[in-house]
């Protein structure tokens, strides 16, 4: 596991460096092809890490009989539909709660057992950092989901969170107990969200760090399954999500490709994040990481 984590870490840092070098100043709003490419990568490389929930469920809930499968699938689908229902009924409140849950979920990238505040700062800055230099772009993105007034308020509030959060993170990274690789990863993530267009930064982060790291850890946590079962769990649910997304877009009244794609991807990620987090919590995945003592995973 340590070798794979080192490789993933080094690759992410390298990709981030190239992205910062060649992607700084790129306006995705004026480059639809690049925007489309970023969204495609987000779906193809980001969504699969949630597809492993099936294997987590088999290992956790001992799904040997049809009734157990139906109970799990029913609970998972109901949770996803409940998220969508809340979004339709109380969009603004739901969006704020989703951002908070996302920050908490992203904080698990860093397996720093003794630095919970640092982890939370890391997760929060992933959400808030773009507000410093890309406030207009972030407002436009949020306005695709919620009203423009709330979007503006959220972005302005994010600025106030970013400054103290960034200072705390900087001070904590001076700590000698934190490995140099973790410091480089954190710096790379923060640089992406500070200097690149929010969609480009999130696509690189979500695919290269969050999803990739989860896949590697999951591979070792789910050791009872064969490689074929692992690949099947990655491929088939991902295909189903893509088909559902295409169907949703075809049924949409407003077929503005850019807006609808971003909206569908967001709602899809939101709907799947809640049951995904629930499955991970039930599986004691984080507890396993702690007991294995992968402090920095390498």
Please name every model-derived segment.
Residues 50-60, 100-115, 167-178, 214-222, ...:
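C-terminal ends of transmembrane helices
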Residues 21-33, 252-256:
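Short, hydrophobic transmembrane alpha-helix segments
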Residues 1-15, 67-69:
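N-terminal membrane topogenic signal
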Residues 35-44, 91-104, 201-213, 265-269:
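Hydrophobic core segments of alpha-helical transmembrane domains in multi-pass membrane proteins
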Residues 59-74, 78-132, 139-149:
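Membrane-interface helix-loop-helix junctions at boundaries between adjacent transmembrane segments
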Residues 118-138, 155-172, 185-201, 239-240, ...:
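Alpha-helical transmembrane segments of multi-pass integral membrane proteins
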Residues 16-21, 74-84, 100-106, 166-168, ...:
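Hydrophobic, membrane-inserted alpha-helices
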Residues 27-33, 85-94, 193-202:
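Transmembrane helix interruption/hinge and helix-loop junction motifs
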């Amino acid at each position: 596991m340590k070798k794979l984590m080192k490789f993933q870490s080094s690759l992410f840092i390298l990709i981030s460096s190239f992205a910062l070098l060649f992607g700084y100043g790129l306006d995705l709003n004026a480059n639809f092809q690049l925007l489309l490419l970023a969204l495609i990568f987000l779906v193809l490389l980001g969504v699969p890490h949630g597809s492993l929930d099936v294997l987590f469920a088999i290992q956790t809930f001992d799904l040997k009989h049809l009734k157990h499968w139906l109970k799990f699938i029913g609970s998972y689908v109901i949770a996803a539909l409940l998220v969508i229902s809340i979004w339709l009924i109380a969009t603004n409140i739901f969006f704020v709660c989703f951002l908070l849950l996302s920050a908490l979920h992203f904080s698990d990238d860093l397996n720093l057992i003794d630095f919970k505040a640092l982890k939370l700062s890391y997760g929060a800055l992933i959400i808030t950092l773009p507000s410093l230099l890309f406030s207009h772009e972030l407002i436009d993105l949020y306005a695709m989901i919620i009203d423009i007034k709330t979007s503006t308020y959220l972005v302005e509030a994010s600025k106030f969170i970013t400054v103290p959060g960034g200072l705390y993170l900087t001070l904590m990274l001076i700590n000698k107990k934190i490995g140099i690789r973790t410091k480089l990863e954190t710096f790379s993530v923060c640089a992406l969200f500070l200097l690149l267009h929010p969609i480009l930064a999130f696509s690189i982060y979500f695919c290269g760090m969050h999803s990739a790291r989860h896949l590697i850890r999951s591979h070792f946590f789910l050791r009872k399954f064969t490689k074929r079962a692992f690949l099947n769990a990655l491929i088939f649910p991902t295909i189903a999500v893509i088909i559902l997304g295409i169907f949703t877009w075809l049924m949409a009244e407003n077929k503005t490709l850019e807006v609808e794609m971003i909206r569908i991807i967001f709602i899809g990620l939101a709907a799947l994040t809640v049951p995904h987090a629930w499955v991970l919590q039930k599986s004691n995945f984080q507890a396993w990481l702690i007991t294995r003592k992968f402090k920095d995973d390498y």
